[in-house]
């Protein structure tokens, strides 16, 4: 009653109902669906009123109204200058009849609120796009280039609206609009001249404007103190330019939705590397700090070998060693050692010799202290790249899952989408037939994005049309482990990671090959690993030949008919240069109501903040299990709050249940790395892999990151660390237990807005 008063508006009453209902979620997680229904009622009222239809509608009425709502939405969106007028030329009556209004009931509160806050098309903050119209608009946009537009749009709609698969955020934002920028990731190489440097920064601004996430390779730019021949002066190095990149990302907001997001990469032999690793520190000269930009190390195998062998490492300026940037594997090692020899003879006089282990320690201490630079591995990305015949992978992207060639002439682009694994389990195992069906449609949708995409920069269009890379990923991995009653920290989970990714990989590659039969192979196909019958599983051999057996520990088992698929590709070709990448999926996992990507559950109960305020999120499978055991009550809720969403310290919960519902910090990093290693053998790009460590130490970090390298991982993402002090609790004077952290973040270094695992707003790779 306290929310009701004389003069209260209907909108305030509706808002109060939602807020009241969502407070009940912590006691009974199914209230998330009840809250979503109340919110749905409000959304319908807002949208239908704007479209001039009626002020509210029940569920059965809405199922009747959806065809008309679609028609009016298209008319209004085109009139407002937002939607592509070509949508109106499709058979709207047929599409309207295909809408499944009952699927409105599948949303959790968080999923629907996320769509309302961030995705639905609006006019002066009034949303007039209804949930199923949203999915149909995206599907129509993706079908514009098809011959059978309506048939394909309905096929795409059924995949999205059933939550079997979800396109990435830029695709959901912009498909079917006047500016159809549907791609998630852009990768660029910055040349070593002033014109090229500022051209790259301008490209960043233009690409970021339309919600793309950026990865920049800065290795070619000469180091601090090296000579500039044109002026006979000394270079200020990479860092001052990175400060400009940082401030540009802040200044350019993504279509009014959020500030731009960028990650800068530097190779470990660059003379500026010691300053580069400190860019995110909160102390020191602020003119040489980038507080809003992500950074990543691009580490060659030779450096890791030198660390292991306790040897020295030489830093060069790229203006003296220009070819190192384009070399990898044994060719890099040979040339690097030749340059080292030239320092002995005096041919190269600008260099710095350091202890490899000392630099490694500094890299690890900065990753712990600031969360950056991330650790990513150059040689494995190149040696296992299908496209090594036409270029070099010089960096990854904003979320470290994309590994595509870049050069001064080519900006790499990748379009993402993720299969919801929880919808592909039947009778306790993977539903192979459904996985094949889902992936066939998903690959087609991703390939369509390339042709209908809006390209803000010509070099991006050139490379995307030439190579046609896409990135199919997965989400809901930990939810599936719950369904299978399998703890993440187990050999069974590692084996499931292997078999599930093998199946996704097999059908993704097959679908791209089948699409090539229909549409033709991508233009740079000849000479690729694909054309030689070398699939991702086969490229491990190339890595082993370069690195040596003693520095590689990778499982190479397989279960599917890969020989048959090799023959199919030789006959049909393949449509896309790269087919798979596992993105973080933070936002789209919220929409579909599953665990993010390959992430372990962060906490079993926590308070989430978004544009609509704070609300509790609980682990629904865990609550169901505890209910079955008669253990779910108010005391359990308070215990979970007290222990920050962890079940480990609650004595009345059986041990096997504690193992099953262990949170991220309770799972040894070994298990995450082993599962990632098994997946990586099947993936032609990479995976966004966050690592979690409880009570970190230099030794633990050293073991963890060296293990990641030895297991053949291409990239790692954030390091999440939690000190011993964060688990200490005290009872407040009132006797109430401490509330769980409102952000569900560990006590670690402040992180940027980009791609935080508990930030539902990251638009780049999700």
Model-derived features: positions:
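Polar, glycine-rich mid-to-C-terminal structural blocks
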Residues: 278-279, 287, 291-363, 367-370
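Often metal-dependent polyanion-binding catalytic scaffolds in large enzymes
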Residues: 1-128
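Terminal amphipathic helices with adjacent charged low-complexity linkers/tails
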Residues: 31-75, 108-113, 299-303, 320, ...
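Gly/Pro-rich turn-and-neighbor structural signature
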Residues: 127-195, 333-365, 370-375, 500-567
